[in-house]
Every structure is written in structure tokens, then in C-alpha cells.
Regions:
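Catalytic core of pol beta-like nucleotidyltransferases
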Residues: 1-21, 29-35, 45-104
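Short beta-strand->loop micro-motif that forms the acidic, two-metal-ion catalytic signature
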Residues: 40-44
Length: 104
């Protein structure tokens, strides 16, 4: 089950970032979180959306003031994600074990 705070964060990221997909992964996706856990989000961005580092900075800025729990955000372009999700990578873990919370 996705927490209310995770839903709020994913909605804000969807509106501000315009991703192709948003995954929640890690302990919150596996329902094994504890008091010190953070949210882990993977944003699959359109291939023409620009530099991943700059996109990450924008994503973190968009969440200022709306979250209580720490958040980690990973940005990847769609073509890379689609290739890497079948290899032993973070993308495979996200694809297999993550929760797809948004898809365009």
C-alpha cells in the first residue's frame, strides 16, 4: 500500500517533472519500511527531457516544504530504462520490485 505522503510526493513530481513513469521502490514498495526509512522514487523521463543531473535538481526543488520523510530520487531516460531493466542494474530492481505509481 502506498502511503498518503508517498502519493502526495508522486503527484507533485508528476505535475512538476512530466515523467513517462514514476516508480516507488525500496522499503516502502516492499512494505518493509521503518522509522528511519526514506522514500525511493525512480522517474522515467522522456529521452528529450535534458540532463539527468539538472532534472534531479529540479525534482528535489519541487518537493521543498511538502515532505516530512527523506526522499531519494533517481532520474533515467526512457530508452535507457527500457534497455537496462533486463540487465543486472538498479533499473531491473525498480522494474521487478518497484510499484508503478504513475504512467503517462
Amino acid at each position: 500500500m502506498i502511503t498518503e505522503e508517498a502519493r502526495l510526493i508522486s503527484d507533485k513530481l508528476r505535475l512538476e517533472m512530466n515523467p513517462v513513469k514514476i516508480y516507488l521502490f525500496g522499503s516502502y514498495a516492499k512494505n518493509t519500511y521503518h522509522a528511519d526509512s526514506d522514500y525511493d522514487f525512480y522517474l522515467v523521463m522522456p529521452d528529450d527531457s535534458g540532463n539527468e543531473i539538472l532534472l534531479g535538481q529540479k525534482a528535489y526543488r519541487s518537493l521543498r516544504g511538502i515532505r516530512k520523510t527523506p526522499v531519494d530520487i533517481v532520474i533515467g531516460h526512457e530508452s535507457s530504462f527500457e534497455t537496462l531493466k533486463f540487465q543486472p542494474t538498479l533499473e531491473r530492481e525498480v522494474f521487478r520490485d518497484g510499484v508503478l505509481v504513475y504512467e503517462k
